Amino acid sequence: MCRGNLYIISAPSGAGKSSLISALLERDKNDSMTVSISHTTRSPRPGEIDGVHYHFVSHEKFEQLILENSFLEYAKVFGGNYYGTSLLNIEKNLAAGIDVFLDIDWQGARQIREKRPDVKSIFILPPSISALEKRLIGRGQDSQDIIAKRMEKAADEISHYDEYDYVIINADFDQALVDLEHILRAERLTVNYQKTQNAALIHQLLVK
């Protein structure tokens, strides 16, 4: 069985990352890809389901998992809550031939690259700063103060785009989705991937 690929997908809030990932999964008819479900110590928000949106655990449980080296990466964010990516769940999916997406920021991406040099990373950029702000306002979810803070954070996040393997500019959603699909397909056609996944065939072809 072919092994899945591990992908990091990062973007400033409002760039369309979550929508692109959701659309990609909807078009996946073979269950060949999934999003890693993070662990967190924060309380569930209305409509969130344990095991679907996050694995909700106590601080004590999370810190126990840290001691057990259960996370590929984790962070303690503003407000004191932990977020972490489970190593076991990722490995199970990759071994089953499933591509796994990590929806994380550039700081988490740095942690993972140090541990997993095989990871592929994609950064989603907005077509302009004004378009990003317009999308955040159009959501109708945040106050002007929160939007201002998100915009300030976005400038910092965007400055790290060149740490990634691929960049997609989400000016047109459908085209950005096609670009994302092409990246996934291309990664399964690299020489290194084919040498690993089709070693027996290549050996047979080279036998004189």
From Swiss-Prot:
A Pfam family that this protein carries is Guanylate_kin
* Claim: ATP-binding is one of the keywords in the record: yes
Reaction(s) catalysed by this chain, per the record, are: GMP + ATP = GDP + ADP
- Keyword Protein transport belongs to the record: no
Give every Guanylate kinase-like domain span. 4-185
- Entry's InterPro entries? GK/Ca_channel_bsu, Guanylate_kin-like_dom, Guanylate_kinase, Guanylate_kinase_CS, P-loop_NTPase
Q: Which PROSITE patterns match?
A: GUANYLATE_KINASE_1 (PS00856), GUANYLATE_KINASE_2 (PS50052)
- Name under which the protein is recorded: Guanylate kinase
Q: Which organism is it from?
A: Histophilus somni (strain 129Pt)
Q: What is the lineage of its organism?
A: Bacteria, Pseudomonadati, Pseudomonadota, Gammaproteobacteria, Pasteurellales
